[in-house]
Amino acid sequence: MELDDASRHGFGRMGFGCKHYRRRCRIRAPCCNDVFHCRHCHNESTKDGHELDRHAVESVICLVCDTEQPVAQVCYNCGVCMGEYFCSACKFFDDDVDREHFHCQDCGICRVGGKDNFFHCEKCGSCYSVSLRDKHCCIENSMKNNCPICYEYLFDSLRETSVLRCGHTMHLQCFHEMLKHDKFSCPICSMPIFDMDKFLRALDAEIEANMLHIDYMGKGWIVCNDCRDTTQVYARVAGHKCCHCQSHNTCRVAAPVLPA
């Protein structure tokens, strides 16, 4: 029995695709002329490391009738919808609309999570959760870098990202792995990732009670990972405190070289 237009349109929904996306078409990569389910499948399979430009895709192959054709949401041969979500700018298809895709004009790509839940930060150059609006430290193009833990490019990564207090970014999964290994400072700038006030007050009290004068070894120089100030302090075994901002997030450095 021949399917009506509505049945034909929805035929095979969520039944085709790859590990990255549910879709009823494959794309022809203009860079190498090979066929892949998506750009991620292409990027994972190339031996020379070249990546597919999503905006350059010109033709797709319907997975229902195997017809190659120009990029469009509906197959012109069999009438099947090749992706319930379709972006003509990104040449992007996905049947899983629960992911709440939206296209950000400023980012120039499609994102997931619902347009109302995100805003585009002009300085950081990416979409962030509305919970971070006016509540994050801006770093220019902070998302257009590799994750400092796994080194995957963050801007168009499929994995969720986390914005640290200092403004640097990493994958949320990598952030949790870092905590499991008792790493509590940014791997890029060494600023603490949590509010350390309570811990530092306790450290001050411990130093005051147990380390008075007994372990002074002259003077030395420290650099503060919070305010970046370099100061000279009494050298201790532990607990060097920044004279500028009172932080203990410091490390020993060589004495500065004074001009002749």
UniProtKB/Swiss-Prot annotation:
Expression (tissue specificity): Expressed in roots, leaves, nodes and panicles.
Q: From which residue to which do the RING-type zinc fingers run?
A: 147-190
Keywords on this record? Answer: Cytoplasm, Metal-binding, Nucleus, Stress response, Transferase, Ubl conjugation pathway, Zinc, Zinc-finger
Annotated GO molecular function terms are: ubiquitin protein ligase activity; zinc ion binding
Q: Where in the cell is it found?
A: Nucleus; Cytoplasm
Q: Which reaction does it catalyse?
A: S-ubiquitinyl-[E2 ubiquitin-conjugating enzyme]-L-cysteine + [acceptor protein]-L-lysine = [E2 ubiquitin-conjugating enzyme]-L-cysteine + N(6)-ubiquitinyl-[acceptor protein]-L-lysine
Q: Where are the zinc fingers (CHY-type)?
A: 11-80
Query: According to its record, what are the GO cellular component terms?
Result: cytoplasm; nucleus
Q: Which Gene3D superfamilies does the annotation name?
A: 2.20.28.10, Zinc/RING finger domain, C3HC4 (zinc finger)
Its biological function? Possesses E3 ubiquitin-protein ligase activity in vitro. Possesses transactivation activity in yeast cells. May modulate abiotic stress responses by negatively regulating antioxidant enzymes-mediated reactive oxygen species (ROS) removal.
* PANTHER family associated with the record: E3 UBIQUITIN-PROTEIN LIGASE SRFP1, RING FINGER AND CHY ZINC FINGER DOMAIN-CONTAINING PROTEIN 1
The miscellaneous remark of the record is: Plants silencing SRFP1 exhibit increased tolerance to salt, cold and oxidative stresses. Plants over-expressing SRFP1 show decreased tolerance to salt, cold and oxidative stresses.
Please report the name of this protein according to its UniProt entry.
E3 ubiquitin-protein ligase SRFP1
Annotated gene: SRFP1
